[in-house]
């Protein structure tokens, strides 16, 4: 699957017997999604060992199979639906990222589910007053607790989520001494002041907060944003959030944390674009500008999980084009594809960042690394510029070799190798590895 950078069985299996083997594996009831997920988590835990700080980034995506619904109905009476009542499954992984290098190292959990077409509506369920455990939004708490439990105890864990994760129960249940939250705020919450009988809305409080600093960062093009250097105004305050006045969290004790408000100045905001603006709620101590900017940097790592979804859906793996007939087979394929897509993505990231701290052992076996040494020597040219400049057995070193196998010239004047280059390089590498194993 990694070699052919596809989640479509007919594409990642060359021969008929390979295709039949893949179909039998995915449809084998004795091979569960839980067993595959357990392997992914074990790999992530191994990769996380010895790391001081882990960013555990949550997000949800829809995998839509509406184009194949008739095929699926042959084996499954009701394959389940996602948004817009279309056939599919929800995917909610927690991507674990090393906080110092900003390189992903695996998954601490992956949740998949869909809805019954006969499920009651939010109004019929009286959704606002349902216990949080009965809501789909409980996934944010459940996945946060799993990250806390699965990852090494001595590592600091920061659970990162976008606006959907702004749930009061998350703040009251998850944080410990070394498990922190960094969540983008969306709700207009009440904040308690020194006088317990007085409160003010969070947005009002932050708009009136003292301007702490101005700083800038580069915005890459995409998602309706133009490339630019965004000039930001930074504010932060310690706040005490009051429990909601309605719903299952009503009457809960208030929660004390920090709010970071960062907003782009009009001088750097392009015409017809809204300014970048984030209100981040965090349990990390934020008493200096440096601490606030560091938290913002961690939050900006959310682009990694968004990029992973793009790789999984469009840039090669095409998971929504997989033509399997059962939900269970598709969910197994999604798990396997996630790990394969991550390996391809990390190769490109390691090359782009020129990071020599990450070991290639995370994504390559010892035998594969031995072959990388052999192939790497042959991939180097006669000039200094065509020599692999990276520390041996680092991920950047491996990425340079794979890029060369993918027909990258090693000259800086040539464009940076992309996903297709790394796909082609991996294809050649694993073809050579099959022969290498036979010989050795």
Functional labels for PLM-detected ranges:
Residues 1-73, 81, 87-90, 95-440:
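Single, function-defining residue in the core of a domain
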């Amino acid at each position: 699957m990694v070699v052919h950078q596809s989640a479509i069985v007919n594409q990642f299996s060359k021969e008929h017997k390979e295709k039949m083997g893949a179909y039998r594996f995915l449809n084998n009831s004795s091979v569960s999604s839980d067993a595959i997920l357990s392997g992914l988590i074990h790999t992530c835990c191994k990769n996380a060992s010895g790391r001081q700080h882990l960013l555990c980034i949550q997000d949800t995506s829809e995998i839509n199979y509406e184009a194949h619904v008739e095929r699926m109905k042959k084996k499954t009476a009701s394959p389940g639906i996602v948004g817009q009542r279309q056939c599919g499954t929800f995917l909610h992984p927690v991507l674990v990222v090393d906080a110092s290098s900003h390189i992903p190292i695996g998954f601490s959990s992956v949740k998949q589910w869909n809805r019954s077409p006969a499920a009651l509506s939010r109004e019929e369920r009286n959704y606002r007053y349902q216990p949080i455990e009965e809501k789909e939004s409980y996934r944010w708490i459940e996945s946060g607790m799993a990250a806390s439990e699965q990852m090494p105890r001595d590592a600091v864990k920061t659970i990162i989520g976008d606006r959907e994760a702004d749930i009061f129960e998350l703040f009251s249940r998850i944080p410990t001494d070394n498990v922190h939250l960094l969540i983008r705020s969306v709700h207009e919450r009440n904040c308690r002041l020194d006088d317990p009988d007085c409160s003010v809305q969070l947005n009002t409080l932050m708009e009136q907060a003292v301007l702490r600093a101005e700083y800038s960062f580069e915005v890459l093009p995409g998602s309706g944003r133009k490339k630019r250097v965004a000039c930001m105004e930074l504010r932060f305050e310690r706040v005490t959030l009051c429990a909601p006045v309605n719903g299952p969290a009503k009457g809960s004790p208030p929660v004390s944390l920090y709010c970071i408000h960062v907003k782009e100045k009009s001088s750097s905001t392009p015409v017809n674009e809204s300014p970048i603006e984030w209100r981040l709620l965090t349990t990390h101590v934020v008493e200096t500008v440096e601490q606030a900017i560091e938290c913002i940097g961690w939050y900006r790592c959310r682009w990694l999980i968004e990029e992973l979804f793009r790789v999984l859906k469009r840039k090669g793996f095409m998971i929504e084009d997989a033509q399997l007939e059962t939900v269970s087979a598709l969910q197994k394929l999604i798990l396997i594809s996630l790990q394969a897509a991550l390996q391809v993505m990390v190769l490109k990231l390691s090359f782009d960042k020129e990071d020599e701290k990450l070991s290639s052992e995370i994504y390559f076996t010892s035998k594969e690394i031995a072959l990388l040494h052999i192939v790497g020597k042959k991939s180097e040219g006669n000039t200094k510029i065509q020599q692999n400049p990276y520390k041996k057995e680092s991920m950047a070193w491996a990425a340079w070799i794979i890029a060369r196998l993918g027909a990258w010239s090693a000259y800086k004047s040539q464009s940076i190798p992309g996903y297709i280059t790394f796909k082609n390089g991996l294809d050649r590498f694993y073809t050579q590895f099959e022969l290498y194993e036979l010989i050795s």
